[in-house]
UniProtKB/Swiss-Prot annotation:
The modification N-acetylmethionine is found at residue 1. Keywords: Acetylation, Endosome, Golgi apparatus, Hydrolase, Lipid degradation, Lipid metabolism, Membrane, Metal-binding, Nucleus, Phospholipid degradation, Phospholipid metabolism, Zinc. One of its GO terms (molecular function) is N-acylphosphatidylethanolamine-specific phospholipase D activity. Its cofactor is Zn(2+). One of its GO terms (cellular component) is early endosome. Zn(2+) 1 binds at residues 183, 185, 251, 282. Zn(2+) 2 binds at residues 187-188, 282, 341. The lineage of its organism: Eukaryota, Metazoa, Chordata, Craniata, Vertebrata. This is N-acyl-phosphatidylethanolamine-hydrolyzing phospholipase D.
Length: 392
């Protein structure tokens, strides 16, 4: 997207109204993918200039930093202390026991791919393991942080291995219109999955990625890529009424030895005429979620992490625990949430079944119903009706 075309995409109001998608001038070329390739630009946002929003920040070395007092950088000594002195309580059992405790279901779309894509005000969510969810809303099908590989690692011969297989392959997915990437850690941005999705869908698939990730996406062959800073927005061509806003989170980025925080991290707020979806990505707890809820809430559905949180002295800055996940649910004003980032990879020291148990305790503490924060089986779908009653 060139500068002249970008300048045509102007906002027409200072405040995002909760009752409808913001109207904006849109003289974008209807030709589609050619005009959107390798884009570093978005609509011009008035609210990005507001004084009370937390803007992305870089340090003196030009790398992104977390702007909240709730953040502390992970250090090599603290990492070594965790690895050497902390006991691993994950206790992942054999496959037979896992099949009983964490069954992997066949997603509905494998046998009936034509059924994918809800109409009107309906919303359906399918958990595909870890932070990968498929969301059908407002005539679009979205995928978050796709990883279908056996390992979350630069090599499929070593590194964290799934103890629950992916419920489907990329080839078995239905039509996907957009992929949301929260950050570049290997368990959220898997090169093999990106390449497979790009080979399957090509330029028909729009990628929404954080600032600094565009070059990496290009090297994977992806062309229909939109790279955004916090509080910037864009859309899928032909679906201008659904707005994708890159919003803050408290985390960090790294893929190689020397590239710490050269790429931004964040969450996603997807705002449609019928539904609103929030994807928290990977995050510690911070004040950003109240800002997001204030501007874009209430959300019909939020996908919020509940796992990889022990030991707290090391993990709390980068990974919320189940109680903090409930706080995010409240902060963003989610009507329903779905638990992600658990039950797939053993990335921390809590027992592999502890996250949903602790989530139930937290929901009771905050006087919320268990059905307010869904815990799905791998491959399971849930349909959310317009009257806010969920149906399997």
């Amino acid at each position: 997207m060139d500068e002249n075309e970008t300048n045509q995409l102007l906002m027409t109001s200072n405040q995002y109204p909760k009752e409808a998608v913001r109207k904006r001038q849109n003289s974008r070329n209807s030709g589609g993918s050619d005009s959107s390739r390798f884009s570093r630009k978005s609509f011009k946002l008035d609210y990005r200039l507001e004084e009370d929003v937390t803007k992305s920040k870089k340090g003196k070395d030009g790398r992104f930093v977390n702007p909240w007092p709730t953040w502390k950088n992970p250090s090599i000594p603290s990492l070594l202390r965790w690895v050497i002195t902390e006991r691993d309580h994950s206790s992942v059992p054999c496959s037979k026991e896992l099949d009983k405790e964490l069954p992997v279901l066949k997603p509905y779309f494998i046998d009936d791919p034509e059924e994918a894509g809800v109409r009107g005000a309906g919303l359906r969510v399918t958990w595909l393991g870890h932070a990968t969810v498929m969301v059908e809303m407002d005539e679009l099908i979205l995928l978050t942080d796709p990883i279908f590989s056996a390992r979350a690692s630069p090599s499929q011969r070593m590194g964290p291995k799934r103890f629950r297989r992916a419920p489907c392959t990329v080839e078995e997915l239905p039509r996907i219109d957009a992929v949301l990437v929260s950050h570049n850690h290997y368990d959220h941005l898997d090169c093999n999955s990106v390449i497979a999705l790009n080979e399957r869908f090509g330029n028909e698939l729009r990628w929404f990625v954080p600032l600094g990730l565009l070059d990496w996406m290009q090297k994977c062959g992806c062309e229909n890529v939109i790279e955004l800073d916090w509080w910037e927005e864009n859309c899928v061509p032909g679906h201008d009424k659904v707005t994708f806003v890159f919003t803050p989170s408290q985390h960090w980025c790294k893929r190689t030895l020397m590239d710490d925080n050269k790429v931004l991290w964040g969450s996603w707020s997807v705002l449609g005429p019928w539904n609103r979806f929030f994807f928290a990505g990977d995050t510690g707890y911070c004040s950003a979620f109240e800002e997001i809820g204030k501007r874009f809430g209430p959300f019909d559905l939020a996908a919020i992490p509940i796992g990889a949180y022990e030991p707290r002295w090391f993990m709390k800055y980068q990974h919320v625990d189940p109680e903090e996940a409930v706080k995010i649910h409240i902060d963003v004003q989610a009507k329903k949430s779905v638990a992600i980032h658990w039950g797939t990879f053993a990335l921390a020291n809590e027992h592999y079944l502890e996250p949903p148990a602790k989530l139930c305790e937290a929901l009771e503490k905050y006087r919320l119903k268990t059905e307010d924060f869904l815990v799905l089986k791998h491959g399971e779908s849930r349909y959310l009706n317009t009257d806010d009653e969920d149906v399997e």
